A protein has these predicted regions:
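Conserved, structured C-terminal
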Residues: 1-185
Length: 185
């Protein structure tokens, strides 16, 4: 018998729904993977959660460092639109991201896929955190920052040549009914 078990991969990525083990794991903190609004902590974006919870002291310290303009971690999850041939299969490994000018990799893609409505590849991935915060003080990627992505040959326009990529907001497309994450971004 056939039954639906999950959203289509491009819809998951489009909505910014994270996959445990692919987009985040126990080595990531909530701020790093765009879940800071969950820490805030009614989930509405304010910084006044009074209840105690595991890791509260570390997250409160990180919150203060972010507010002070410090960078308590190196990589931030971002959305990207990128070139190349349509990505139509799951990435068996992370694909490297380099600065626009080239050079050594500085990050990696976690979830790439072809977006049929946008007619381009979209992806979530980690790039250097530059300290950009949204209006509510939560970390985010700097929209418009350009990178190069090293795709496997099957998706590369020219084998061995990285494709252009640009940081965009997550979710990639606004929801019909905005959720808390979209409201506080």
């Amino acid at each position: 018998s056939l039954m639906v078990i999950a959203p289509a991969h491009h819809r998951r990525i489009q909505a910014g729904i994270l996959s445990w083990g692919q987009d985040m794991d126990q080595q990531h903190n909530p701020f790093q993977c765009n879940l800071g609004y969950q820490v805030s902590l009614s989930g509405k974006g304010e910084w006044n959660k009074t209840a105690d919870y595991v890791g509260k002291a570390a997250l409160e310290k990180m919150k203060e460092e972010l507010k002070a303009g410090k960078k308590p971690y190196k990589l931030q999850l971002v959305g990207m639109e990128l070139g190349g041939k349509p990505i139509d299969n799951y990435a068996p490994d992370f694909w490297l991201v380099s600065p626009e000018s080239g050079g050594d990799p500085v990050g990696f893609l976690t979830s790439p896929w072809w977006h049929p409505e946008k007619k381009t590849n979209i992806a979530m991935g980690y790039v250097p955190f530059d300290g950009t915060l949204n209006a509510n003080g939560f970390p985010k990627g700097k929209v418009g920052t350009k990178y190069k992505v090293h795709l496997p040959e099957q998706y590369s326009e020219t084998p061995g040549t990285p494709v252009d990529a640009v940081v965009v907001d997550i979710p990639f497309k606004e929801s019909f009914n905005a959720n808390t994450r979209e409201v506080v971004k």
